[in-house]
Amino acid sequence: MAIAGGISSYVLLPNPLVLSHLETELPMFESAEIGHAIDKDTFDAEVPALREALLEVQYELQQQKRFPVIILINGIEGAGKGETVKLLNEWMDPRLIEVRTFDQQTDEELARPPAWRYWRQLPAKGRMGVFFGNWYSQMLQGRVHGQIKDARLDQAIAGAERLEKMLCDEGALIFKFWFHLSKKQMKARLKALADDPLHSWRISPLDWQQSETYDKFVHFGERVLRRTSRDYAPWHVIEGVDSNYRGLTVGKLLLEGMQNALKLPKGKASGMNPAPLIASVDKKSLLDSLDMTLRLDKDDYEEQLITEQARLSGLMRDKRMRKHALVTVFEGNDAAGKGGAIRRVAAALDPRQYHIVPIAAPSEDERAQPYLWRFWQKIPARGMFTVFDRSWYGRVLVERIEGFCTPADWMRAYGEINDFEEQLRDAGVIVVKFWLAIDKQTQLERFQAREDIPFKRFKITEDDWRNRDKWDDYRAAVGDMVDRTSTEVSAWTLVEANDKRWARVKVLRTINQALEEAFAKTDKHDKKKRK
């Protein structure tokens, strides 16, 4: 949702559309160092109406359940961030506001990609989430204290932009607040608190630390704000000296932003109309290159199956696995044998090492979140293995075919999925993706067999027959999916599955090869570090 919520008289940044094209740093904090203040009489006169309006818009947000509100809190220590959020909780219904603080990463978080900790805390549609210590705090602290260099900061900035763009495209309304104090104001505030026996406890080590690194923090903060203020998620710089001004400004920005978003027509599609995808002119698909006659006889199958299962068992116990997690994605035609292949993989492992996640239609809670949210919840820790039976690719397959999302939604999903998988790769997750392919005649034979065999009858449903009628549509969607998401980061493996034995062995062998290649890269990297 492209909502630049805010009131022009309170937005202290240049137009974000103009700002995003500037190449030189701007003194964008100057307007937050001029002594903004609201007298007590004015504050007391305005608060009742503002509070009533905020409650009204908050309950309308809850009733409509069309989008979540995400509030990112950043800025100078001592500039009133916590006090302002406390005030908002007093003015609004705190039961509908989830305040989250991201301090030092826990062991659970360190074992997963960096974005995992944020995805699992996203507010559902109809609710508000306040994030302290968010992705901007992490990148700024890292750069100020020399834990990362400029190149890594630029990567983090680009990652934040992609994350926010996706959340907004999924409907989220994002407010980004930078609470500011000049260096002189910050030191004066800290001294006043330190001299007050009743309030000195409010000063944290981080406050004193930031007073020493103020110039660097503001320098890199300006760079981050300049690079990430966009029309869909602009920054609002708030002078933090006067609590009355601070509270009214934030309250009015939230009010007008939410009012504007709620006025948009229901079901309004996000984004522009995408360029159309056309079928291959010569009707050829990558699936046509598969040799569907490949098969294994029973003796060869049993020998190779045992060999590959033993190989997988050993690789999963390898000490180098402690630096990695493994994710396998199983997609394919109905009746292509995904379940049988997954069982042969699981048979090689200790049940404590893996988790199988069957994916069906999203639940009510899952529909209240961005579509990738439910998959982020299941990303394994290092040393562990998660099998997805169906996956995030439903966005560009069944949701595309059945019209469950707009063309703009599934078209942008290719890039979002590539970014998601790159984040996994960068965190040490090995992603192996399978499309199990069978021809139309083989599918018909398996459907008929399922109807004829009582203990297999549960496997066949009306949806299977209905999907079969859309064979050509799915074939085109699979071709587009492979073309756009088979990358160096995470390639698709197309599995000839007319013969189930061949398919099962190929799946196991591919997983083993992926693990061995990842371990070899780990060895090379460790050897280079030792030098």
Task: Set out the residue ranges of the language-model regions.
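Glycine-rich phosphate-binding loop of ATP-dependent small-molecule kinases
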Residues: 2-531
